[in-house]
Amino acid sequence: MTPARERRPLVGIVDYGAGNLVSVARGLEIAGAEARLIRRPEDLGDVELLVVPGVGAAAPAMARLEAAGLVGPIRAWLEADRWFLGICLGLQLLFDGSDEDGAETLGAIRGRTRILSGGARLPHIGWNQVERDRDHPTFEEIPDRADFYFVHSYAGRPEGPTAGELVLAETTDGSSFISAVARGRMLGVQFHPERSGPYGLRFLGNVVDMVRRDGGVDAAASPVETGPAVEVAASAVQVAAPAVESVV
């Protein structure tokens, strides 16, 4: 992990009632970052990496983000190619929409989230291999086909002529689905790194290292004004989380 003397990038974790925020915050803190909960646009301030975690369905998730006034700022963040990590539902929300409930989502990735097929047992819960399609700094010092933890019934399917360039890794459980994507500073994973043991922490550490090397925030590039924020106190919480209550 990153030595404590190095700069700790500020990470904003979107709190919209659909994620295990404390475990995500704890994992990021272990990885060398500082964590802040994002509940309104003004909380973004000097955040360097925006993380959208989550479990559940797309429609209520988008409704909560809209009610918090965060849909526009998140879209602006993505359009500005600022550092972003979507985890599980957070990855699915990057697509145009979801077949689960017909919701229109953030539209950063052309394609839709569709139910797993090909004989997969639903929901797909547990450890499974992540097989890389290409090398990427997020998987540095992580062996190919390493096991990560999944909890979901749907997965995003990129479309269009450049869809293949977006995919970092795939996983097979009855059928193959996209388990990691990257485009510029936009990252997304279907697995839960905060629940995936040493490899999950290594993944988060790699992301934090990428943000650190990229430098601090350019205030002029921020899509929202700086405002008061809620810091996360997660130091006493275990990284491993209890069983989830809902499944995407």
Where are the regions that the model predicts?
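Short, surface-exposed beta-strand/loop micro-motifs that present aromatic residues
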Residues: 175-182
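Structural signature of beta-strand start/N-cap positions in the alpha/beta core
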Residues: 34, 49, 83-85, 147
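Pocket-forming structural segment of enzyme catalytic cores
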Residues: 96-173
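Acyltransferase
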Residues: 2, 186-233, 241-248
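Extreme N-terminal starter segment of soluble prokaryotic enzymes
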Residues: 7-12
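Beta-strand-turn-beta hairpins that frame and shape the catalytic cleft
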Residues: 145, 182-187
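Cysteine-nucleophile active-site neighborhood
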Residues: 55-127
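Short acidic low-complexity segments
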Residues: 35-46
